Amino acid sequence: MRLNKYIAHTRHCTRREASRLLARGEIKVNNKVVKEESYRVMEGDEVTHLNKPLQEQIVYRYLLINKPKHFTTDIGDKDSKYIMGLIKKEDPTGLIAVDHMGPKSVGLLLLTTDKALVEKLNQKNRKVRRVYLIELNKDIEEKDIKKLLKDRKTLKIESASHVDGYKANYIGLEMTIGSENILKGVINRMGFEIQRIDRSYYAGLTKKDLKRGWIRPLQEMEERMMKHFI
């Protein structure tokens, strides 16, 4: 990493201010004065300002996207568009999706550089509240909806019902344990096919005021709320 960028990442000052410190000869690397902004800081190097150690602080990124249809989080899916293609103004370096969403899935998706958070969210039996609107290939009766609520080791559906204002082939569903792939498998074995699955809520986050295909960083309050819910 370039030295001026490293200094900025310690939150000691901005990158522009770091350039001034370097020009004044106030920065040392391994006890030697360095004035070049382009100097590469290597792992194990000690960087100091006026003999006070500067340590890089990891700043994680959290991006919320309202995913449109035909995009996928699977880079190996040759028949669909990779989700990172939507990120034009953001640096995709290190970003990963918190969970899998295929081409028929739309709605709320979180991208982050925080690998520990992703691992936590995907722990087996970790309860993470998610809300979906699901369009099926045919009408579904109440008796079949009740079958969805059956307890399973790999899937926990908290509620499922028809939705006011939608046809009988739509259901609203809330689950806390399991993946979309597991949910799709259960629905397929019941004789139905999912035409579209739209996620509106995930771990305290919503897609309110976020248009389809749009992306924005999480606000600090949203980040705290999300971590509170998990």
Model regions: which residues?
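Basic, flexible Lys/Arg- and Gly-enriched helix-loop patches that mediate nucleic-acid binding at interfaces
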Residues: 1-230
